[in-house]
Curated annotation (Swiss-Prot):
<dbReference type="InterPro" id="IPR015421">
    <property type="entry name" value="PyrdxlP-dep_Trfase_major"/>
</dbReference>
<comment type="subunit">
    <text>The glycine cleavage system is composed of four proteins: P, T, L and H. In this organism, the P 'protein' is a heterodimer of two subunits.</text>
</comment>
<dbReference type="GO" id="GO:0016594">
    <property type="term" value="F:glycine binding"/>
</dbReference>
<dbReference type="InterPro" id="IPR015422">
    <property type="entry name" value="PyrdxlP-dep_Trfase_small"/>
</dbReference>
<dbReference type="GO" id="GO:0019464">
    <property type="term" value="P:glycine decarboxylation via glycine cleavage system"/>
</dbReference>
<dbReference type="InterPro" id="IPR020581">
    <property type="entry name" value="GDC_P"/>
</dbReference>
<comment type="function">
    <text>The glycine cleavage system catalyzes the degradation of glycine. The P protein binds the alpha-amino group of glycine through its pyridoxal phosphate cofactor; CO(2) is released and the remaining methylamine moiety is then transferred to the lipoamide cofactor of the H protein.</text>
</comment>
<dbReference type="Pfam" id="PF21478">
    <property type="entry name" value="GcvP2_C"/>
</dbReference>
<comment type="similarity">
    <text>Belongs to the GcvP family. C-terminal subunit subfamily.</text>
</comment>
<dbReference type="InterPro" id="IPR015424">
    <property type="entry name" value="PyrdxlP-dep_Trfase"/>
</dbReference>
<feature type="modified residue" description="N6-(pyridoxal phosphate)lysine">
    <location>
        <position position="273"/>
    </location>
</feature>
<protein>
    <recommendedName>
        <fullName>Probable glycine dehydrogenase (decarboxylating) subunit 2</fullName>
        <ecNumber>1.4.4.2</ecNumber>
    </recommendedName>
</protein>
<dbReference type="GO" id="GO:0005960">
    <property type="term" value="C:glycine cleavage complex"/>
</dbReference>
<keyword id="KW-0560">Oxidoreductase</keyword>
<dbReference type="InterPro" id="IPR049315">
    <property type="entry name" value="GDC-P_N"/>
</dbReference>
<dbReference type="Pfam" id="PF02347">
    <property type="entry name" value="GDC-P"/>
</dbReference>
<dbReference type="GO" id="GO:0005829">
    <property type="term" value="C:cytosol"/>
</dbReference>
Length: 485
C-alpha cells in the first residue's frame, strides 16, 4: 500500500475521486466569458489530479518525512552556514502586528516596521564597519549584483567609464564571476598561492586604470583568513579600484574583525545564513548591501530615514541606482535576523563565531590522516578536504558523500571550491555539540575504512533511501520539471 504513496500526486489520480463536494451555488451564475477577456481563458480544463483528502494528506505527509533539514540532523554544507535557527525568531516574525501589514499602508501606520528596518541597518553597520546599508536585495547573489551596480555607478559618476574589469580570485565564492558578468564587467581571475591566499604579485600584475574593483570572500572558500588583506586593500585603492566583500563567510569573524576596518568599500551579507533565518528550502533569503559613506548616495531607493522620532521612506536620492526589487525587501527575514541579533547581543555574536571556528578546527584535526586536507593550517569556520588520504580503487568524493546519507548525515558541499581536486567542504557551524561532531567524524572515518575494504559498497551508495543514486548530470542538463500525461 505504501508503494503508491511513493508516486507523484498525479499518478494517484482516479477519475471521479473527490476531496470535497462544494455546496450548491446560491448566487447568480455568470459565464467566465462575461468577466475575463478571451485571451485569458483556457481552451480546455486544467489537468489537475483527482484524489481524495486522505490521499492528499498521506502523500504530502510521507513526502515531508523524506525531507532533511537542520531541525532533523547535522547539515555540514560548506559555504552555506546551516546553523540551527532559534524558534523565538519565528515567533517574532509571526506577530500579527507584522504579518498583517501591507506594503501600501501609509507610513504613519507602519512606524514599528520602519523602526525595525532602521535599527537593523544600524546593527549591520556596527557589525561590519560600514556606514549605510540597503535591505532591499532578496538574497546573496542579488546582493552581489546590487553592490556591483553601485561600484559601476560610482565610477561612472566620476566620469571614469573605462573601468570595465572586476578581479575575482579563484578561491572566491562561486557566484562572484557570474554576478560581475551580469553587471556588465569583464572578469579577470587571479590564482591563489600554495597557501590558499591571494598571490600579491599576481594581483599587482592585473591592477590598472581599467579595474573597477576586486571581489573577495574573507575568509575564503578554503576556510582561510586572508592575512594580507590590509595590503590588498591598499593596492586596489592605489589603482583607483574598490574592494568588494562577499559576506558568505562572515559567520567566522563577527565581533572579532570587521570588513570595513580591513579596507572594504562595499559588502553584502546573507541574513539567511549568518543571522539565523531558515534557508535551503525554508526561505526566502535576504542579501543586504552595505557601503562606506562615499558610496551611500548610490544605494537603492528607498532608504529608511528618521527625523524627530518619525521614520520615513526616502526616494529623493538623485544618484541612486534606483529600485532593485519591488517594495522594501524580504521583511519577514529582517524580523528574524533582528530578533537573532538582539537575542545574541554583541558578546553572543562574537562567541558564535569563536565556536564556529573551534568546531571546524576540531573536526579537521579528527579527520586528518583519513582524508587529505587541502591547505593544512588553522582554518576559520570551515575547511576543505581533498579526497581520501589513501586512494582506494576509483572511490571518489561523490561516493563518500552518498555513503554519508546511509548513516543519516547530510553530505557536505562537494567539488567546490573548484581549485581543490576531489573537494569535500565542511562547515559545522557553532550550534553543534561535541557529541554530534564526534559522531560525524567517526562516520567519515568508518567510510574511509570501508573504501579500502569494500569500495563497491561506496560506489553503489546510498542503499537506504527511497530513491537510489540519480543521474545528476542528466537531471541538470535535461530537467523534467513539469508533469504531462
Amino acid at each position: 500500500m505504501l508503494k503508491e504513496y511513493n508516486s507523484l500526486i498525479f499518478e494517484l489520480s482516479k477519475e471521479g475521486k473527490k476531496a470535497y463536494t462544494l455546496p450548491p451555488l446560491d448566487v447568480e451564475e455568470k459565464p467566465l466569458e462575461d468577466m475575463l477577456p478571451k485571451e485569458m481563458l483556457r481552451e480546455k480544463e486544467v489537468d489537475l489530479p483527482e484524489v481524495s483528502e486522505v490521499d492528499v494528506i498521506r502523500h504530502y505527509t510521507l513526502l515531508s518525512q523524506k525531507n532533511y533539514g537542520v531541525d532533523i540532523g547535522f547539515y555540514p554544507l560548506g559555504s552555506c552556514t546551516m546553523k540551527y535557527n532559534p524558534k523565538i525568531n519565528e515567533d517574532m516574525a509571526s506577530l500579527p502586528g507584522f504579518t498583517e501589514l501591507h506594503p501600501y499602508q501609509p507610513e504613519e501606520t507602519v512606524q514599528g516596521a520602519l523602526k525595525l528596518m532602521y535599527e537593523l541597518e544600524k546593527a549591520l553597520c556596527e557589525i561590519t564597519g560600514m556606514d549605510r546599508f540597503s535591505l532591499h536585495p532578496a538574497a546573496g547573489a542579488h546582493g552581489e549584483l546590487t553592490g556591483l551596480m553601485i561600484i559601476k555607478a560610482y565610477h561612472e559618476h566620476r566620469n571614469d567609464k573605462k573601468r570595465k574589469k572586476i578581479i575575482v580570485p579563484d578561491s572566491a565564492h562561486g557566484t562572484n564571476p557570474a554576478s560581475a558578468a551580469v553587471a556588465g564587467f569583464d572578469v579577470i581571475e587571479i590564482k591563489s598561492n600554495k597557501e590558499g591566499a591571494i598571490d600579491l604579485e599576481a594581483l599587482k600584475a592585473v591592477l590598472n586604470d581599467e579595474v573597477a574593483g576586486l571581489m573577495l570572500t574573507n575568509p575564503s572558500t578554503l576556510g582561510l583568513f586572508e592575512e594580507n588583506i590590509v595590503e590588498i586593500a591598499r593596492l586596489v585603492h592605489e589603482a583607483g579600484g574598490l574592494l568588494y566583500y562577499d559576506g558568505a563567510n562572515l559567520n567566522a569573524i563577527m565581533g572579532i574583525s570587521r570588513p570595513g576596518d580591513m579596507g572594504f568599500d562595499v559588502v553584502h551579507l546573507n541574513l539567511h545564513k549568518t543571522f539565523s533565518t531558515p534557508h535551503g528550502g525554508g526561505g526566502p533569503g535576504s542579501g543586504p548591501v552595505g557601503v562606506k559613506k562615499e558610496l551611500a548616495d548610490f544605494l537603492p531607493v528607498p532608504t529608511v530615514e528618521e527625523k524627530d522620532g518619525r521614520y520615513f521612506l526616502d526616494y529623493d536620492r538623485p544618484l541612486s541606482i534606483g529600485k532593485v526589487r519591488s517594495f522594501y525587501g524580504n521583511f519577514n527575514v529582517m524580523i528574524k535576523a533582528y530578533s537573532y541579533i538582539l537575542t545574541m547581543g554583541a558578546e553572543g555574536l562574537k562567541r558564535a563565531s569563536e565556536l564556529a571556528v573551534l568546531n571546524a578546527n576540531y573536526l579537521k584535526e579528527k579527520l586528518k590522516g583519513y582524508y587529505k586536507v587541502a591547505v593544512d593550517k588553522t582554518c576559520m569556520h570551515e575547511f576543505v578536504l581533498a579526497g581520501l588520504a589513501e586512494k582506494s580503487g576509483d572511490v571518489r568524493t561523490l561516493d563518500v558523500a552518498k555513503r554519508l546519507i546511509d548513516y543519516g548525515f547530510h553530505p557536505p558541499t562537494i567539488y567546490f571550491p573548484l581549485i581543490v581536486e576531489e573537494a569535500l567542504m565542511i562547515e559545522p557551524t557553532e550550534t553543534e555539540t561535541k557529541e554530534t561532531l564526534d559522531a560525524f567524524a567517526e562516520t567519515l572515518i568508518k567510510i574511509a575504512k570501508e573504501a579500502k575494504e569494500n569500495p563497491e559498497l561506496l560506489k553503489e551508495a546510498p542503499h537506504n533511501t527511497p530513491v537510489r543514486r540519480l543521474d545528476e548530470v542528466l537531471a541538470a542538463r535535461n530537467p523534467v520539471i513539469r508533469w504531462t500525461k
